[in-house]
Amino acid sequence: MLTQPILENLQKLRFYGMLTALEEQMQMPDIDKLSFEERMGLLVDREMTDREDRRLKTRLRKAKLRQQACVEDVDFRHPRKLDKRLFMSLADCRWLKEHNNTLIIGPTGVGKTYLACALAQKACREGYTALYFRLPRLLHDLSIAKADGRYDKVMMSISRTDLLVLDDWGLDKFIKEHRHDLLEILEDRHGLRSTLVTSQVPVKHWHEVVDDPTLADAILDRLVHNAYKLVLNGESMRKKRSNVQRHI
């Protein structure tokens, strides 16, 4: 049987995994020892693996994570009081299934962004979609989106993603426009999707960051009350690495 037409049709159908696997089988001298069902099973398995790999790459590309991080590489030896049991519990992504939130709080340099990106990367590996933003940049971009007509489209994209990562919460107090934008984002996601926030500011001071008592209650009610909290302390890891490099 001529295989070239089969290879061409697999290419047209975009069955790239099956195509590669069939080409590999054609080079195996003992492949005829396998039954038709066994060979077909190998082809289908390769196609499924190939498609999942491509979907994962797409999810990671769209997530735009700031750091290449994964939960397996998290350093629990650094003295920053990272609750390993809680973090590994979050790494199983059950909180995403339950539409809960996560807050990572701690001083600068203790690895908040890395931990957030590691959890987001794990979510992508588990089949969830994710989006990473530095909150100050997101709020600035939303202001621009209102001016050029993209606001509704951007907000829709944010509302639909399974995990929204908002990094650097509370670097500055929110102005009126930003308070309303943030409330709209959290209202659209409350009870439906999960949000992960990192901040140098302790949660007890977040009312001051929002800078409006009524809207602060509304925003924090949708964000904090169903959230897991990772509270970190300790010396900056960036500073520590810098000191080590200077002594090398």
What does each of the following model-derived ranges do?
Residues 9-12, 17, 61-82:
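Dynamic helix-loop-helix/coil hinge segments at AAA+ ATPase domain boundaries and subdomain interfaces
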Residues 8, 20-23, 38-42, 58, ...:
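Solvent-exposed alpha-helical segments within well-ordered globular domains of core cellular machineries
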Residues 16-67:
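Interdomain "pre-motor" coupling segment immediately N-terminal to P-loop NTPase/helicase cores
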Residues 163:
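Walker B motif beta-strand of ABC-family P-loop ATPases
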